[in-house]
A protein has these predicted regions:
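Alpha-helical cap/lid subdomain in secreted, periplasmic
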Residues: 31-43, 59-209
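Serine-esterase "nucleophile elbow" of acetyl-processing enzymes
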Residues: 1-53, 58, 63-72
């Protein structure tokens, strides 16, 4: 069974992306999931990571054939949304909530026509107040919340598996502080990646194991 992870830097985590290579799984939650399932079920799963740092939903859609459909996965995992907000603050190149929803829906519609038996796991984007988010915190949080709502809506609309993460990070931050889990409010620490992996594995077990 082939499992494909796609997303932005949170998924990329330093993977080998040269010339479209999918050899490296990266150093984040995808690697932790790979390690656990490979240990528990030797030889059963193949893992591919095509996450690219800086990606927004429009970038994911733009490379849908080469980095997704052509790989013909059995399970597709998508975590996207924070750059659609973040890029507006620094580069004025964000993706509005309305466009985010439209492109997300188009991606799912087109994918399910192309790969009708595909199992899809949608991960909720998340954010905490820390160094990268504090300056525009209220707007940042409001806009990420809109993308979170879209992802949940898409999961409901297409009857797909949804992994809730924002509330898990908020609860965790009450114990040890935001930057213990998300170093800058966006990018997970090792503990943050483990939190994502744990929640992903719970969802995966419900639909596959």
């Amino acid at each position: 069974m082939k499992i494909l992870f796609q997303g932005d830097s949170i998924t990329d985590t330093g993977r080998n992306a040269e010339c479209g290579s999918t050899i490296s799984i990266g150093q984040g939650y995808a690697m932790l999931i790979d390690a656990f399932l490979s240990k528990e079920y030797p030889g059963k799963y193949e893992f591919i990571n095509t996450g690219i740092s800086g990606n927004r939903i429009v970038d994911i859609y733009q490379r849908i054939k080469v980095d997704f459909w052509n790989l013909k996965p059995d399970v597709y995992s998508l975590l996207i949304g924070v750059n659609d907000v973040w890029h507006e603050f620094g580069q004025h190149n964000g993706v509005s909530a309305e466009r985010f929803e439209n492109v997300y829906r188009m991606l799912l519609n087109d994918t399910l026509k192309e790969l009708p038996n595909l199992k899809i796991i949608l991960l909720e984007p998340f954010v905490l107040k820390a160094s990268a988010t504090a300056e525009h915190w209220n707007e940042f949080k409001t806009e990420v919340d809109k993308r979170r709502a879209v992802v949940r809506k898409m999961a409901d609309e297409f009857n797909l598996t949804f992994v809730s993460l924002q509330d898990k990070f908020v609860k965790a931050a009450q114990i040890c502080g935001a930057d213990y889990w998300l170093a800058d409010g966006v990018h997970p620490t090792p503990a943050g990646h483990q939190l994502i992996a744990d929640e992903w594995l719970k969802a995966f077990k419900n639909i596959v194991l």
